Amino acid sequence: MPGRGGQSLSMVCVDVWILALSVLSVMADATSVPVTESCDSQGPPGLPGPPGLPGPPGPPGPPGPPGLRGPTGIPGDIESCLSPPKSAFAVKMNDPLPAPSQPIVFKEALHNDQDHFNLTTGVFTCTIPGVYRFGFDIELFQHAVKLGLMKNDTQILEKESKAKDNYRHLSGNVVLQLTLGDRVWLESKLDTTETEKGPIQSMFFGYLLYGNYPG
């Protein structure tokens, strides 16, 4: 039956052809290189992140070089230095003391450069207000002495001593605040009959410690 034989042959040929295509397809898959995407591909840049926290301060830098010398300054004003005021005296006498309740007149000046002590009246007059020191020294023999240091008719200090058959020494000093025109002197407080027995030597002194300056 030639019709069936030709049909069978055609089917065999088709199967062989399909088999051949399958083998070729398998071989092609085995030898083909898989296609992959490139690893070098990059997307678009992202948005900037927020600022970071400040870092700690760095160590101090080395000293810089010396600067240039500045210009010479303007000369200052020259003021004269005033010397402090002076007032001092020292007087003595070798005579008996005068009658009481009056200034003792000292006839010899050991120092009286400013003439603030009056040798005629025996009175010191303040011409520089300030703080003064006044004092006296008496050497006596067979005498009774009583002295008062006066300021403007007010007794500030009183001293007395008696020497029968020997020598005695009597001294006193005081610090006074004086204003312009104040007067200071030394006077006897005993009657002259009590002081005219033996020799006597008297010294009276005073000097400015410091003046009263404004401000």
From Swiss-Prot:
PROSITE patterns reported for this sequence: C1Q
Transmembrane segments: none
Record keyword Secreted present: yes
Record keyword Transmembrane helix present: no
Cellular compartments annotated: Secreted
Region of interest called Disordered, as start-end residue ranges on this chain: 35-79
Residues annotated as domain C1q: 82-215
Superkingdom to which the source organism belongs: Eukaryota
Residue ranges occupied by any Collagen-like domain in the UniProt entry: 43-76
InterPro entries (UniProt xref): C1q_dom, Collagen/C1q_domain, Tumour_necrosis_fac-like_dom
Record key words, sorted: Collagen, Secreted, Signal
One Pfam family recorded for the sequence: C1q
Name of the protein: Protein HP-25 homolog 2
Species name: Bos taurus
